[in-house]
């Protein structure tokens, strides 16, 4: 049988029993071992063919000659990839898969919550509420509707599509970019290649960064992009802090070149008390909670079930990382 190692550093006590039930349903085809990183026995490492983990330390990886699949449970795997992860000592390739899609519902609702807050002044009313101030006149020229606006979603993957679907329900026009614009991409009115990314920026009232962080996507949004904004534009980052140039975004929003910013991810987390983000003008900050939802492990279990079924049937696995990125 194939040996599966769950690197469980206290994520969720239900995770082990849930994965156990999934593995048992394959009638002995797979065997599950669950250990914390520090406690994995040598013989288990040598047998392991599939790893389920948040990250796989290189020290453990080197002791796994038979690895076939690494299944991360995060959608972003920046900082978790290294050359020897992809190839065994005998030259055999290893599949690396992400948790893409697990977070789609929560991340997309998170972005919509920020958008709606700006459109309807919820954050302004909240401040006024705490100050016991009736702020109707102050808000009068700041409110608008999402309906009729154009949203540009940079990264039209599973999270990007979930955002687009919800934006369309609000009557917004959806434009996206992705590496392969020929791929079928539901919920988008227009899909552009990353080369046409500045066309998206010019067309958008709201811009959402929903990409993984790779060497190609780092500092994707900065001074140059802020300079070409043609209208009051709101910018949201649900991906990673490294996708944009924080210094220029802060300067842009504080000087009014960017209408408002919604941000869930930062270069430094937790955000230190003296960070300029806390005092940025018209900015909504959330503490990297976009992916948080109570069904998280259930969704991860469903992904593992799909992967094991594919392996059992000799079909390709999903969510695979392209090692050339």
Each model region followed by its residue ranges:
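N-terminal glycine-/charge-rich "phosphate-binding" loop or analogous flexible N-terminal tail
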Residues: 1-48
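Phosphate/diphosphate ligand-binding glycine-rich loop within oxidoreductases
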Residues: 47-129
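Glycine-rich, N-terminal phosphate-binding loop of Rossmann-like dinucleotide-binding domains
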Residues: 55, 74, 209-211, 238-239, ...
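Glycine-rich NAD(P)-binding loop of Rossmann-like domains
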Residues: 93-95, 125-162, 190
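Rossmann-like dinucleotide-binding domain for NAD(H)/NADP(H)
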Residues: 96, 232-234, 238-325
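Oxidoreductase and adenylate-handling cofactor-binding alpha/beta cores
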Residues: 108-124, 168-172, 302-315
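Conserved beta-strand positions in the Rossmann-like core of class I SAM-dependent methyltransferases
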Residues: 175
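Rossmann-like adenosine-cofactor binding region
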Residues: 179-276
């Amino acid at each position: 049988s194939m040996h599966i190692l769950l690197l469980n550093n206290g994520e969720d006590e239900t995770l082990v029993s849930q994965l156990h039930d999934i593995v048992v349903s394959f009638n002995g085809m797979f065997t599950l071992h669950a250990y914390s990183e520090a406690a994995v026995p040598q013989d288990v490492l040598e047998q392991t063919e599939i790893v389920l983990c948040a990250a796989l330390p290189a020290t453990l990886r080197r002791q796994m000659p038979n690895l076939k699949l690494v299944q991360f449970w995060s959608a972003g795997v920046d900082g978790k990839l290294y050359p020897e992860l992809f190839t065994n000592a005998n030259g055999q390739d290893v599949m690396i898969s992400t948790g893409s899609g697990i977070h789609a519902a929560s991340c997309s609702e998170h972005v919509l919550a920020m958008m709606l807050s700006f459109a309807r002044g919820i954050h302004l009313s909240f401040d006024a509420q705490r100050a016991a101030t009736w702020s109707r006149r102050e808000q009068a020229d700041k409110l608008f509707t999402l309906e009729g606006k154009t949203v540009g979603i940079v990264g039209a993957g599973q999270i990007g599509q979930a955002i687009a679907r919800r934006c369309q329900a609000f009557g917004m026009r959806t434009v996206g970019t992705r590496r392969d614009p020929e791929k079928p991409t539901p919920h988008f009115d227009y899909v552009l290649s990353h080369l046409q990314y500045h066309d998206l920026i010019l067309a958008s009232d709201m811009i959402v960064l929903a990409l993984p962080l790779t060497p190609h996507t780092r500092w994707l949004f900065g001074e140059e992009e802020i300079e070409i904004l043609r209208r009051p534009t709101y910018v949201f980052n649900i991906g990673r802090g490294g996708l944009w140039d924080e210094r220029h975004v802060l300067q842009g929003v504080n000087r009014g070149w960017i209408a408002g910013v919604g941000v869930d991810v930062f270069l430094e987390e937790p955000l230190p008390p003296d960070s300029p983000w806390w005092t940025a003008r018209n900015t909504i900050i959330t503490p990297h909670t976009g992916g948080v939802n109570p069904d998280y492990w259930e969704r991860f279990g469903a992904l593992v079930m799909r992967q094991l079924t594919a392996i059992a049937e000799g079909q390709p696995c999903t969510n695979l990382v392209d090692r050339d990125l």
